[in-house]
């Protein structure tokens, strides 16, 4: 499911005030981190992630890998922070 530009705008605004709930360190994506990410994104749908890697291209690759593995989508990235969205069909939340 591709996010439309109008939907992305709404999600970006909603994600602005969020605090990062997951921090990815130098070790990258471990099984335990992926498990925690799955639980968190199922519950919240829209989450902010902080990535503690200084290299910009490595951060981008890590975010893409995370989204591919979890079937989620990047809403926005600013520096070392990314906002990620995945719709939970069981959730009652309405973003748009």
PLM segments and residue spans:
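Positively charged, polar, low-complexity stretches
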Residues: 1-96
